Amino acid sequence: MKTGIVTTLIALCLPVSVFATTLRLSTDVDLLVLDGKKVSSSLLRGADSIELDNGPHQLVFRVEKTIHLSNSEERLYISPPLVVSFNTQLINQVNFRLPRLENEREANHFDAAPHLELLDGDATPIPVKLDILAITSTAKTIDYEVEVERYNKSAKRASLPQFATMMADDSTLLSGVSELDAIPPQSQVLTEQRLKYWFKLADPQTRNTFLQWAEKQPSS
């Protein structure tokens, strides 16, 4: 099983389309959802960037940073989930620029009025729409895909309805089932399709790191 997955992932290294924009990841940003799809944290762990095509995009993320307290101690600050939408048309690189977040006062100010910039490769600000993702679920584990779908259907400041339509069900991710030798349970198919999706977005170094990790995993 492991060999089959690795072989499939190696095949995905072959170019299938031309990506035009590199999203540089920040160590202070925990990316949760990209364009309506949950981010594969295991695949992106340690990645410096992911590749995007030209056009509108939407990120859902939290800012996570160690801040200093008045008693000389430290704590991990975690922001509420934020939504930012932007367009990468004619842009080859996107970089995060966060405000100063070093102490409790600055963290509280950011909670009350989040603000940040996305910069292109020339350090020019990219027009963005930023909002807080209000979580409606009371479940212990939050399904961010569901929350983002609800948000995108509600005509909020940073909503992009086209991503709500894409995530109404997983039919787009399941459309490639026919390429498998046998039809496994839907949950397994969906997991594989999601893995393929994020593998294709990852930069070459991240792909290689993931493949090396996959080779070391025990066969099921």
Swiss-Prot record:
Q: Which domain of life is it from?
A: Bacteria
Q: What transmembrane ranges does the database entry give?
A: none
Q: Which first-to-last residue range defines the signal peptide?
A: 1-20
Its keywords, alphabetically, are: Signal
Q: Which family does it belong to?
A: Belongs to the UPF0319 family.
Which NCBIfam families does this one have? CrliSynInhib (NF047712), PRK03641.1 (NF002967)
Provide the protein name. UPF0319 protein YccT
Q: Which organism is it from?
A: Escherichia coli (strain 55989 / EAEC)
The organism's taxonomy opens as: Bacteria, Pseudomonadati, Pseudomonadota, Gammaproteobacteria, Enterobacterales
